C-alpha cells in the first residue's frame, strides 16, 4: 500500500512540474505591465494569457499527467486515456447533463456538479485510466477486432469504465465535494493557525507523495479557496467569490509561504551561500552541484 501511494505521488509530480512555468510567464507579464495587466502591452498580455492557460486547465493536466505517470512504460496512450476519462466524467456530471438525465430543473441540481471540473476529479480520472492502461495495453482481441488490440483498446475500455464511474459519482459526488469543502474551510477559517496545520499535513504526506492532493484543496478552486488563482488574478477580484465563512481569516497567498516563492528564489540564495562558503579546493564541484540544484528548483519546484 505504501509503495502504491508513493507511485501515485510520483505521478502527481508530472502535472505539478508545470506550475513554475505558469508562475514565470505570469510574473514577467505582470512585471511588464503592472497597472494594465496586459491591456497596455501585447507582450504582457501574451505572457499573462499563456500562464493563465496552464492554471485554468490544471484539472485536465492532472488527468493526463497522472495517467501518464502511472503507466508502466510512460506511453502516450495512457495520457490519451486520461483525457478521455476526464472529458466523459466532466461532461456527464455537468449541471446541464445531470439536469437532463435526472429530469429535474437545473436550479434543483446540487451545486457540487457546478464544480465537477476540478483537480480532485482530474487526479481520480488519471489514477483510474493509468491503471486501466497497465491492465489492458497488451490485450489481444479476436482477429476480426485485431485493429483494436493492445494500446488502442485502452481508450475504449476507459470510456466504458468512466461511464460507470460517472453513474456512481452522480450519487456520491455531492458528499465527496461537501467533505472536501468542509476540510478546506475548517482549516482555512483558522487563519495563520490553519496555514500552519496545512503546512504540517503537507510535510507529513511528502514521503508518500500525497501532499499534492492536499495542495489541490488549498491552491486550486476545489473548495473555493483557490490561493494560486486569487494571487495571480486581478487584485480587485481577489476576494470577490470567497466563501463567507473565510471572510476575515483568509489572506491571498497564505498557502504559498514556504513553497514556490522559496523554491524559485529562497533556495537560489541558499545555493549561492553554499558556493560562497565552500572551500577553494572544492568550489568547482560545489558550483556544479548547486547550479544544477538551483536550476531544477527554479524551473520545476523540486
PLM features: residue spans?
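Juxtamembrane membrane-interface segments at transmembrane alpha-helix termini
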Residues: 36, 89-100, 157, 190-197, ...
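Alpha-helical membrane segments and immediately flanking helix-loop junctions
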Residues: 58, 242-302
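Early transmembrane hairpin of solute transport permeases
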Residues: 2-143, 147-148
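Juxtamembrane interface elements at the cytosolic ends of transmembrane helices
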Residues: 128-144, 160, 168-180, 212-216, ...
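Membrane-interfacial loop-to-helix junctions in multi-pass transporters
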Residues: 53-58, 116-120, 150-156, 187-197, ...
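Aromatic-rich transmembrane-lumenal/periplasmic boundary elements in polytopic membrane proteins
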Residues: 173-231
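Interfacial juxtamembrane loops and adjacent helix segments
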Residues: 221-254
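A cytosolic-side transmembrane-helix exit/cap motif
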Residues: 96-107, 196-202, 235-237
Amino acid at each position: 500500500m505504501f509503495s502504491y501511494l508513493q507511485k501515485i505521488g510520483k505521478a502527481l509530480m508530472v502535472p505539478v512540474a508545470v506550475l513554475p512555468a505558469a508562475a514565470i510567464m505570469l510574473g514577467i507579464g505582470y512585471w511588464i505591465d503592472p497597472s494594465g495587466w496586459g491591456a497596455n502591452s501585447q507582450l504582457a498580455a501574451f505572457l499573462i494569457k499563456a500562464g493563465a492557460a496552464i492554471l485554468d486547465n490544471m484539472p485536465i493536466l492532472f488527468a493526463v499527467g497522472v495517467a501518464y505517470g502511472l503507466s508502466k512504460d510512460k506511453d502516450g496512450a495512457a495520457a490519451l486515456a486520461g483525457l478521455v476519462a476526464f472529458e466523459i466524467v466532466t461532461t456527464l456530471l455537468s449541471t446541464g447533463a445531470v439536469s437532463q438525465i435526472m429530469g429535474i430543473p437545473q436550479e434543483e441540481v446540487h451545486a457540487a456538479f457546478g464544480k465537477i471540473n476540478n483537480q480532485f476529479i482530474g487526479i481520480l480520472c488519471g489514477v483510474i485510466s493509468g491503471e486501466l492502461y497497465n491492465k489492458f495495453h497488451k490485450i489481444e482481441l479476436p482477429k476480426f477486432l485485431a485493429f483494436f488490440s493492445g494500446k488502442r483498446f485502452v481508450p475504449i475500455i476507459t470510456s466504458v469504465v468512466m461511464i460507470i464511474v460517472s453513474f456512481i459519482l452522480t450519487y456520491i459526488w455531492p458528499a465527496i465535494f461537501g467533505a472536501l469543502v468542509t476540510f478546506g474551510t475548517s482549516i482555512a477559517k483558522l487563519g495563520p493557525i490553519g496555514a500552519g496545520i496545512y503546512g504540517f499535513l503537507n510535510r507529513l504526506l511528502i514521503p508518500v507523495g500525497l501532499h499534492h492532493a492536499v495542495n489541490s484543496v488549498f491552491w486550486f478552486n476545489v473548495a473555493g479557496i483557490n490561493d494560486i488563482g486569487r494571487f495571480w488574478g486581478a487584485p480587485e477580484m481577489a476576494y470577490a467569490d470567497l466563501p463567507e465563512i473565510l471572510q476575515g481569516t483568509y489572506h491571498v497567498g497564505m498557502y504559498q509561504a514556504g513553497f514556490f516563492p522559496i523554491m524559485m528564489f529562497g533556495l537560489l540564495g541558499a545555493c549561492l551561500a553554499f558556493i560562497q562558503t565552500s572551500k577553494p579546493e572544492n568550489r568547482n564541484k560545489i558550483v556544479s552541484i548547486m547550479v544544477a540544484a538551483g536550476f531544477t528548483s527554479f524551473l520545476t519546484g523540486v
